[in-house]
Design a protein with these regions (language model features):
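A conserved regulatory-domain signal marking ACT and ACT-like small-molecule sensing domains
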Residues: 57, 237-411
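A structural alpha-helix within SAM-dependent methyltransferase catalytic domains
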Residues: 23, 27-30, 162, 220, ...
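Phosphate/diphosphate-binding glycine-rich loops and adjacent basic-rich segments that engage nucleotide
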Residues: 134, 192-193, 202-260
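Short hydrophobic alpha-helical runs that function as membrane-insertion/retention elements
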Residues: 168-172, 226-228, 291, 372
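Conserved dinucleotide-binding and phosphotransfer motif residues
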Residues: 32, 88, 222, 286, ...
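Nucleotide/pyrophosphate-binding catalytic subdomain
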Residues: 1-216, 384-385, 400, 404, ...
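Active-site beta-loop-alpha junctions enriched in small/polar residues
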Residues: 43, 231, 295
């Protein structure tokens, strides 16, 4: 007998019918002899509905009261799922985040988990109950309710699995696993049987929405085996674990991409690290996420800096740079929108030199201009024209043989 933590996202519990389906997944694990802790999100789009209600009353709601409001969404789901299990003859009890011992820092809207008192959950498990826990929420030392921000239910599930020393954490979603790339754009995309923590973390940070980066980081730090599974089809999903446990036959394991990227170039800066520090510190204070950065210095010691931002952040970026023009002393700002970022990810790059060269050769063959490049040990990212995005992904997917990936079930 083992302990399984299951997590069901909003789309997987979006109706009473889907909640019944989730209950059957729980029952299957109980029938297999496992103890089960279930973490759930708010039903469907109910969090958006709550946000809209607040907006009807005020343009600037208190962050504390927003956390109080949003935390009610998961409370609906936990009670309904517990009822569904009880109706099938299985003893179940629902807990809010704070009842489950989820202790966080005192930050409203994006709190981090600092400790978990798992004693109450263990007590109920020992009594033979299924414990249903509200994701996305916790409580600070001063007893204020907090929420964990985007991906908070994933993080709750992984944190509980770590604290309880669970054998596994299953993340149920509306997709059957992690794919080599987005199958909505590339029909030859294949489901991966396995992927390493590091690869999944890169893909998550690059916008692959299956798992939140914070949850993957938690799983890696505490060595929690994760499986992303379909809440609809009863089949194996994608197992996320250490690289040493996996087949290492793939140089590239996945391709991530996102559009709505803009390149900003600040021309004619006086060279010096203090100038660069001023630019990026100022942008960071405005919560502008700067991605790829390229610096060039002319023979006359003039510096230009190019960097990419989300297109939604462009106007704020330009506004900040213009405000500090006197301090920065640049000549002009140039921008280029309608861009996209395409990234290849794979632990096999570490021991296979020449992957970036192959990527650029493939893109050149397709007459796709590469405007910016960024690399890490297991990732190469390029910025290309938005109109070339899907063509680039398809070409790279084909070149690295990702359509031939086997989705063989793991044990």
């Amino acid at each position: 007998m083992g302990l399984i933590v299951q997590k069901f996202g909003g789309t997987s519990v979006g109706s009473t019918e889907k909640i019944r389906n989730a209950a059957e997944r729980v029952i299957a694990e109980r029938e297999a002899g496992h103890d089960v802790v279930v973490v759930v999100s708010a039903m469907g789009k109910s969090t958006d509905v709550l946000v809209d209600l607040a907006k009807e009353l005020t343009d600037d709601p208190s962050k504390r009261e927003m956390d109080m409001l949003l935390a009610t969404g998961e409370q609906v789901t936990i009670s309904l799922l517990a009822m569904a299990l009880q109706a099938r003859g299985y003893d179940a009890i629902s807990f809010t985040g704070w009842q489950a011992g989820m202790k966080t820092e005192h930050v409203h809207g994006n709190a981090r988990i600092v400790d978990i008192d798992e004693s109450r959950i263990k007590e109920e498990l020992s009594a033979g109950k299924v414990v249903v826990v509200a994701g996305f929420q916790g409580i600070a030392d001063d007893l204020h309710i907090t929420t964990l921000g985007r991906g908070g239910s994933d993080t709750t599930a992984v944190a509980l699995a770590a604290a309880l020393k669970a054998d596994k954490c299953d993340i149920y979603t509306d997709v059957p696993g992690v794919f080599t790339t987005d199958p909505r754009y590339v029909s030859s995309a294949r489901k991966l049987a396995g992927i390493s923590y590091d690869e999944m973390l890169e893909l998550a940070n690059l916008g692959a929405g299956v798992l939140h980066p914070r949850a993957v980081e938690f799983a890696k730090n505490y060595q929690v085996p994760l499986e992303v599974r379909s809440s609809i089809e009863n089949e194996s999903g994608t197992l996320i674990e250490e690289e040493s446990s996996m087949e290492q036959n793939l140089v590239v394991r996945g391709i991530a991409f996102e559009d709505q990227i803009t390149r900003v170039t600040v021309c004619g800066l006086s060279s010096g690290l203090s100038t660069l520090s001023t630019i990026f510190t100022t942008l960071a204070k405005q919560n502008i996420n700067v991605d790829i950065i390229i610096q060039s210095v002319t023979s006359t010691n003039q510096t230009s800096i190019s960097f990419s931002v989300k297109t939604d952040d462009l106007s704020k970026t330009v506004e900040v740079l213009e405000e500090y023009k006197g301090a920065l002393g640049y000549e002009q700002i140039e921008t280029e929108s309608k861009l996209a970022k395409v990234s290849i990810v794979g632990s096999g790059m570490v021991s296979n030199p020449g992957v970036a060269a192959e990527m650029f050769a493939v893109l050149a063959q397709k007459d796709i201009q590469v405007k910016m490049v960024s690399t890490s040990e297991i990732k190469v990212s390029t910025v290309v024209g938005r109109d070339d995005m899907v063509k680039a992904v398809e070409a790279l997917h084909d070149a690295f043989d990702l359509s031939k990936v086997s989705a063989a079930a793991h044990s």
